[in-house]
């Protein structure tokens, strides 16, 4: 797909683009929480491309400080490969350990709804060749809520000897303060937390 050619440096153009994007993402109840379903973007190629363009616009200023891009299972997979191909950066997955071979590092975390354990716990892993010591990483996902998944991703990357330059999301539920949790998890005080939309945009 070709870029939308919108001038996203123009605040009004960007504002209108984000408003249109929000209309494409339904909010539905799922496992006891309000779920922002970015799957709606898949049915609208124009808005999907717009999401790519908005991501590119947001990360371009610091991509020279990124060595690899990590994407969370599963919706992070929709966006990270596009960025990886465009900026020529390695892309790696953060998934449950039983979902892929050659797992090197694993961490347990807790999220908004129940995962592997009855207490709501889950596990996140990366593969042996995902990152190298000293790598600077951009993490990509669809949603930042309580920040449990993001925190786990940051700690996992750091456990492997790398650092997180930034995390980017389509939607952030600001009232849950996942941003604060993510920032606290990072050992790099300059780590950026970026979101295209918040719950106030819906």
Q: In which residue ranges do the predicted regions lie?
A:
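Short glycine-rich phosphate-binding loop at a beta-alpha junction
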Residues: 64-73
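Short, glycine/charge-rich flexible loops or terminal/linker lids adjacent to PRPP-binding catalytic cores
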Residues: 89-137
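Short Gly/Thr/Asp-enriched flexible loops that form oxyanion-binding sites at enzyme active sites
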Residues: 78-87, 153-154
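Structural motif
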Residues: 67-68, 136-138, 166
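PRPP-dependent phosphoribosyltransferase catalytic core
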Residues: 2-10, 14, 20-21, 151-202
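A short helix-loop-beta submotif of the ANL/AMP-binding
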Residues: 85-91, 162
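Active-site-facing substrate-recognition patch
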Residues: 2-65
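Conserved G/P- and acidic residue-centered "switch" motifs that form tight phosphate/ATP-binding loops
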Residues: 142, 147
């Amino acid at each position: 797909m070709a870029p939308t050619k919108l001038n996203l440096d123009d605040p009004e153009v960007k504002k209108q683009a984000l408003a249109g994007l929000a209309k494409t993402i339904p909010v539905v109840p799922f496992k006891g929480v309000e779920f922002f379903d970015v799957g709606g973007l898949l049915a609208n190629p124009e808005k999907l491309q717009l999401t790519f363009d908005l991501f590119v616009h947001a990360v371009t200023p610091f991509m020279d400080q990124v060595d690899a891009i990590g994407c969370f299972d599963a919706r992070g997979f929709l966006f990270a490969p596009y960025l990886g191909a465009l900026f020529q950066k390695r892309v790696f997955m953060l998934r449950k350990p039983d979902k892929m071979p050659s797992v090197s590092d694993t961490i347990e975390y807790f999220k908004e709804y129940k995962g592997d354990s009855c207490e709501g716990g889950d596990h996140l892993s990366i593969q042996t060749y995902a990152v190298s010591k000293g790598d600077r990483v951009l993490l990509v996902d669809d949603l930042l809520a309580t920040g449990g998944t993001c925190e786990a991703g940051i700690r996992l990357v750091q456990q492997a000897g790398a650092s997180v330059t930034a995390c980017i999301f389509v939607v952030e539920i600001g009232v849950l303060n996942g941003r604060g949790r993510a920032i606290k998890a990072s050992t790099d005080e300059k780590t950026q937390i970026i979101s295209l939309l918040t719950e106030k945009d819906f």
